[in-house]
Amino acid sequence: MASISDDGMVLSGYHKKLKTMKKKFFVLYEETSINQARLEYYDTEKKFLQRAEPKRVIYLKDCFNINRRLDTKHRFVIVLSSREGGFGIVLESENDLRKWLDKLLLLQRNIANVNGQVYSAYEHVWQVIIQKKGMSEKVGITGTYHCCLSAKSLTFVCIGPEKTANGDDRISSIEILLTTIRRCGHASPQCIFYMELGRQSVLGSGELWMETDNAAIATNMHNTILSAMSAKTDSNTNLINVYQARPDISHEPMRKRSSSANEASKPINVIQNRQNSLELRNCSSPHNYGFPRERCDSLPTRNGTLSESSNQSYFGSNLGLRSNTISGIRPHSTSKHSNSPTFNMPLRCSESEDSSISIDESDDNASFGHYRLNTRSSKGAIPEENLDDFASAEYCKGSGPSGDDNYIPMTPIKPASFCEPDKVELPKPDDPNLHINFPEHTSEKLENDFDLDSDNQCGRPIRAYSIGNKVEHLKLNRRLGYLNDTGQNSNRVRAYSVGSKSKIPRCDLQRVVLVEDNRFDTNRSQNNISKEGPISGTSTNREKKSTSAPLLSLKNQINQDRMSDLMEIDFSQSSKIEPWTPAQFKRNVMDVVPKNIESVFPKSYRNDSSNLTLHATSQKDIFNGGKLNTTESSSEGGYLEMKPVGNAFSSSPVTLPSKIEKLKLKDNTELPVHELHKVSSYNIPPEKRKEQTPTQTRIEEKTLNSQLNEKLINTESANVVANITPNVPELKSDKKNNVESLIIENNNWDLGTTDEKKLVHSISSEDYTQIKDKLNDLTKNNEVGYKILQIKSDSSLISSKITLKNRLRDNLERQQRLTESVNTIPDKSPSATTKGTFYSLGNNFQTPPNNVVNNTLDNILQTKDLNFPSRPSSQASQPELHYAKLDLPNCSDQNPAKYLKRGSRESPPVATCAEDGNTYARIDFDQSDSSSSSSKIFNM
């Protein structure tokens, strides 16, 4: 060894070069005023003495790290790491190692003190070649680097130029925190070491693949870096707090890291051959001491099984094995929840010997207890919260789960079976614990609520009620029961909307419109629409609808006007009308007749019609001219079904077409008429008017000896002039003037003013010829009463007005016209407010003199071939359920001019029969909806 000379030489001697293992003469110089501190080596000492040029000069100021290297097969190696690469010296003994290493570090510190540089104290430095794989090429970290490990980070320092041959930039130096490394491993045959970085690393998430000089270096890198990641040194434990400017709390353990890798990210050679023999490794670094850092495995987590924990082994404190138990105050049963290695797996790595993944291993030589005895409990994974936050395990048993052990009662009173586990009995019905008393809900009510028959209808599951809920529900149903008391045997019912139970659904109005007899002087709008009987038109057992939604206040629902916006149908059956005495006739009729009655529409007050009855026969009988049905209706209440023609469906055995009857009215009263003039402005050809003389008119009228029992069909141009003399004596007459009314079946009628009503229908051209032949047979029938035939048509009619000039001209010709198609009778009953009054002849009345009757009959006009201008048919968008107001004699108390309705395509035919006394009806649709505009009643 050469002595220290005046030029600053400190040490010299023969040592081996690590790369070639050849002996070289090394000379160490300190810093002088002339030269810097440096390390030189020569081939031989002779060349050094001859002042030959050294083989290599390494300046200590360029070395960022000088330390001992333990990853080689040589025991005493010192490595000087610089940007030009690493240089290793193999010494002969430990003493030589200590002497040279201490002198090198002393010179380095002196340089750092002089220049103000700070050198990092790297524990391990490996020279690696980062392959162009994974994320390396993207981030620009490829080529030869120094991999420097410290207690908190892993630093890569570039070796060589900062640009590649292709001109790409290289990262000169970068530091990666150990906490951002997800996992690491090595592959021995290929001398490959790799590691996966997380998203929080400075390079982002990805993998780095590095090639080492030999497989031993790759293995050493894996073990050393994994030990550093798992170490529990003070600097590493509180690394996150220090970096985030938080206080250094050394007694708090670091949080376990979560697994973020999957099997697909592992290399193929690493995944293979996972089952190998157990291998225990010793610590390879003197700096690996202390407790290992708690960290979760890098691979995807899964819940371990009991078989895995049963295969765990005991390991002494002298083995550097990674502990996966939770430290602190948590019990040791809260062990690692995933990926515990089995007995036959290598403990140095969860992977094979050739591919060792950092799962459950550590190079720490620290002492820790036997944690592997029961690393997997049967209670599943334990959360990382403190024990104070854990749920109470009062009902958890150590044995296997059972139905009673794992059940936590939810009853207000804890059953005795949970207080005494040995006595497990089912509660008895008389158990006092089951007697739950609640205010306003007695136990009897609760017992009645649990009725299986009421809830188990149609095989449905039993509904669960809250305490006392069903009791109030049943009370509400009882209070509302009379609103919907039909269909008591329904199994499943549909629900009403909120507040709709008190009203009849509109669909019921479209199917059938019925009102019960007013026998008890109650409001008809409150009666049920479904009544048992052959005329009901609907099913007799209608299902009661449930009220699933909360109903509105009962006070608002049950009122007298809850159906005021709907139609009104009033059919009552009354007793026979008592005849008027002469005093009553004079007081009610004669004294109130206006003087000028020609320009005023006749009005009448409505008599009591509470006992009126309607009877109907089929429409076929009307067309065929059959006899009228004079028997009383078999229905209980005398209902008349109002229904659209043709399209609506009826489930009643008595269908609508069978109920389209002809109307027969029998008037038992005889009307003393002094003079009756019928003014009409029908478009009758002039030649027919000339043929009809007053003599012929009187002859034809005398042949009609039946009782006047027809409805007077007054058009707008037909003004009724009745001059009644109060002083005319009252006469008795047994004669009955029968006027047989035929049907006006012409589509071209011409109507005049709007003073009276006429029920107008038109007939299509296809049916006209058939009906015309049937009417001839109908005229031959000398039956009492009159008929109103309604025929559905394809178009509607509209009235047209005629000027005053035509009206005056028609008044002069009114006595010359008699038709065979229309027979008119008085339309209004005697009234105190009428401007024109008509009277029927009856058996029980005193009749006026014969000349009065003759004068009356002379003025009754029967028109033929009425031609009205047809109006366009109704729009197709109008509904087929029509509303109308039909005022018959002795029934109306309204001015018909107020109820002018427009015709539509179809209208429900109406028919009545005459029985005892005057039988009339009132069909009132005054307050119907917009569809009421399609009525068939015209104000003529």
UniProtKB/Swiss-Prot annotation:
PTM-bearing positions, type Phosphotyrosine: 407, 883, 920
Stretches for region Disordered: 523-549, 895-915
Keyword Phosphoprotein: yes
Ranges of residues in domain PH: 8-109
Record carries keyword Repressor: no
Short sequence motif named YXXM motif 2, residue ranges: 639-642
Disulfide bridge map: none
One Pfam family it belongs to: IRS
Ranges spanned by the short sequence motif YXXM motif 1, renumbered to the chain: 407-410
Matching PROSITE patterns: IRS_PTB, PH_DOMAIN
GO molecular function (one): insulin-like growth factor receptor binding
Composition skew (Polar residues), residue ranges: 523-540
Residues carrying Phosphoserine: 284-285, 340, 548, 904, 907
InterPro entries: IRS, IRS_PTB, PH-like_dom_sf, PH_domain
Keywords: Differentiation, Growth regulation, Oogenesis, Phosphoprotein, Repeat
Record-level GO cellular component terms: cell cortex; cytoplasm; cytosol; intracellular membrane-bounded organelle; nucleus; plasma membrane
BP GO annotations: cellular response to starvation; determination of adult lifespan; germ-line stem-cell niche homeostasis; glucose homeostasis; growth of a germarium-derived egg chamber; insulin receptor signaling pathway; insulin-like growth factor receptor signaling pathway; lipid homeostasis
Domain called IRS-type PTB: residue spans: 122-236
Function: Activates phosphatidylinositol 3-kinase when bound to the regulatory p85 subunit. May mediate the control of various cellular processes by insulin-like peptides. When phosphorylated by the insulin receptor binds specifically to various cellular proteins containing SH2 domains. Involved in control of cell proliferation, cell size, and body and organ growth throughout development. Also has a role in a signaling pathway controlling the physiological response required to endure periods of low nutrient conditions.
Subunit structure: Bindings to phosphatidylinositol 3-kinase and SHP2.
Official protein name in the record: Insulin receptor substrate 1
Species this protein is from: Drosophila ananassae (Fruit fly)
